[in-house]
Amino acid sequence: MTEVSVETSSAGSESPSIPLPLHVDPADLAAELAVVLSERVGEEYLLYERGGAWVLATGVRAMVELDSDELRVIRDGVTQSQRWSGRPGPVLGEAIDRLLLETDQLFGWIAFEFGVYRYGLQQRLAPRTPLARVFWPHGRIVVTRDEVRLFGASAGHRDDVLGVLGDGVPDVREASAVDVVADPSDYRDRVASAVGEIAAGRYHKVILSRSLEVPFALDFPSTYRLARRHNTPVRSFLLRLGGIRAVGYSPELVAAVDNDGVVVTEPLAGTRALGRGEVRDRQARDDLESNSKEIVEHAISVRSSLQEMTEIAEPGTAVVTDFMTVRERGSVQHLGSTVSGQLGTSNDRMDALEALFPAVTASGIPKAGGVEAIMRLDEGPRGLYSGAVVMLSADGGLDAALTLRAAYERDGKTWLRAGAGIIEESTPDREFEETCEKLSTLAPYLIARQ
């Protein structure tokens, strides 16, 4: 029999703890609990992996919905709505802070379009464009390699956890891979257009993306389990929230703010394939570390991130560490750096998020020109793609993972999406190849819904 111990959380509530058997993989268990506790009963949820812990937020006690023209707070079946104007950060932050007076953590996602306001491009958004969805869950379950801990969860949830552990996590089914080389969106032509605009001096860099349709309904939890075994993300996520499903393996942090006010962002720019054998991987790494195009792309991204950090950090505290090291992320390897600073006394986490969002590695340089070009040249609104999945805490903390290397489903359509950084030295064929490399993080591991 599995033993259950009970401790008291920092909020004063009891948090049952269940030891995790050695043979159980925590990622597999967390995804299966999402199925048992949320998928089967039609509840919204978000699973977020950070630092060796998988946090499953189940059910919606209250929801904050921010659109381009309206803020809604939904609680106990009652919707309070208001028009808003100005910057979205303070509007969302105030609604979030009110909920965090009553709970420890909130979870959600931020759309790419949240970031266009900083550059005065909001007039290009359609009415009711989704900007953010953040919720207060009914319960949280935290899975580590040692234990399962329940916060605010019902006795039924505890019994469900024990049931899954007793029955065992089922095996995942066979994947149905999709071909990543189709180019129905004329991606190469759009890259060529961007290179021309860069040569004309309109901007220095832009990230253009392409979507790849998945021709079957996706089993998101099973796909999460299988693909997680083949990826090394800085964060991973699985969610059904605000009308969208997503599963992904984030390669970098847009922003993290800890309870001491330390802000961190980790730009990755410069890419080569990985997983093609030791010799080819070493050759690709050597090329990545010596290729002038990749080095320039990374250096200007880090400079941009440092400038943004300086805006919201205490003077003299913004620094670059671990500069231009190779970081492996599933089917690709990147040049990566860490930029950090001490949050200024007059700023908060939403100021940090607005300054760093959208990620420089998913938008462009300068960001104003890059974002404007994306709104013209990319495939319609990005939504969750290149936005962020977020976890917020009552102590002022924020963890925002860049939403890349992911699959999405909305309104019966399922797709993948990937991009590449375009600079003047770019060639359409190489940038298309880079999108194929990034799509291969997930494309071989898609499992069809039964």
Residue ranges and their predicted role:
Residues 1-76, 83, 202, 206, ...:
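Extreme N-terminus nucleophile/cap motif
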Residues 2-8, 77-215, 440-450:
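Non-catalytic accessory segments adjacent to catalytic cores
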Residues 3-7, 74, 83, 145-164, ...:
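Cytosolic ligand/metal-binding cores
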Residues 12-17, 202-205, 312-318, 331-334, ...:
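Short acidic (Asp/Glu) and glycine-rich catalytic loops that position anionic groups and cofactors
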Residues 26-63, 74, 113-161, 245, ...:
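Cofactor- and metal-binding active-site motifs of prokaryotic enzymes
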Residues 50-67, 128-130, 134-140, 207-296, ...:
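An anion-binding catalytic pocket shared by soluble metabolic enzymes
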Residues 64, 108, 141, 201, ...:
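A residue-level signal for conserved active-site and pocket-lining positions in enzyme catalytic cores
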Residues 335-338, 342-450:
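Conserved hydrophobic core element of enzyme catalytic domains
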